[in-house]
């Protein structure tokens, strides 16, 4: 939680995350005299989304970032179904902001049904620049920036003020971040990038586009070819035992060539051995080497990740941040130096 004075506090949890946390948040916002409450809805499934948004928060402004194939068992197996699940969160007579390219018929139908105003946010005509002061964080994506600017403009916040606030904001633990450092035994130079929280292959592909512009792979530079680049991508794909549908997505993505720009990919988590067997049954295109690691030491894993590759290594975390992903991010944060583009 972030308070009006800029201070932060962890949300206390006695058990798993619950939408009931939003009830406490509303009471806390009222008790502190906040003028505006900004809350992230993380519900999965149409019924929970409807309860969280329409019964508890009842927002006057709702921002929806994208429609992605994730949590398929609860949200739906195709994007139209997922859009219908997300549309269940539309409150009555609210302003709904969505990137223009993410508009689905279900959103238009829900807006009409709830008497809400749908605002498709078109891509910005020019590159987003924060103006005077520090640049935006490496982890900021253009659709999210334009969405935030549109919402803030509707609330009377000037663009320069909004950009300055975003540029000075501390990145979330799970945001796209990069560190430089020396890892392994003997120490070797490496860039470590956390894209763990992107979760699904489509969101991760968007993150890889940003990563590729900053740290081109030895197999491809920003122009598509890189025979002279000695920078090797090594993927650390963290798989969760309770996200079987997501693991299957990653297995399919591997078979379709998702990792063709990677020299090596190391699978992590309990599903890793079974997932590796599936992947090896139909070797993915590109000649990428796949293996798994079942230890718990970030240091030992990094030693393995940066070994046996010439040039600079770019170690990219994908899949999920829970468990091994979180341990790696904390290790990189402790041992590395944050990369500022």
Show the residue positions of the predicted features.
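Conserved beta-strand/loop subsegment of P-loop NTPase cores
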Residues: 61-66, 93-99, 263
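Hydrophobic "anchor" residues on beta-strands that sit immediately upstream
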Residues: 36, 61, 95, 191, ...
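Adenine nucleotide phosphate-binding catalytic loops in nucleotide-utilizing enzymes
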Residues: 11, 72-83, 87-90, 94-202
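A short, gly/pro- and small-residue-rich
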Residues: 54-65, 85, 327-341
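Active-site flanking residues adjacent to catalytic metal/cofactor-binding acidic residues
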Residues: 39, 64, 98-99, 194, ...
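ATP-dependent carboxylate-amine ligase catalytic core
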Residues: 1-62, 66, 70-83, 105
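ATP-dependent carboxylate-amine ligase
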Residues: 154-157, 164, 169-341
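A generic structural signal for well-ordered alpha-helical segments
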Residues: 29, 110-112, 283
